[in-house]
Regions:
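Long, contiguous binding/interaction regions
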Residues: 1-76
Length: 76
């Protein structure tokens, strides 16, 4: 598959703030993640990032994020 880049905004619920979600996304799905902006408080987290990988890996990674309870929105 061809390499692809996605710009995404991830919104984390409070129970996942202390989990290594971005690390796992990068490691388990072989996605290069560049954090562009992050805001984390005691009750939520929001991260804007760029994700680079094969299209199939990106789709699998995004699906996994959603399964974890993370809201994933594309950034134009």
């Amino acid at each position: 598959m061809a390499p692809a880049r996605r710009r995404l905004r991830l919104t984390f619920p409070s129970d996942l703030i202390h989990e290594p979600i971005i690390y796992r996304l990068a490691r388990e799905f072989d996605i290069v993640v560049t954090v562009r902006r992050a805001e984390v408080t005691s009750d939520h987290g929001s991260v804007a990032l760029e994700a680079d990988a094969d299209e199939e890996q990106l789709e699998r990674g995004i699906a996994w994020l959603a399964q974890q309870g993370i809201n994933v929105e594309p950034i134009a």
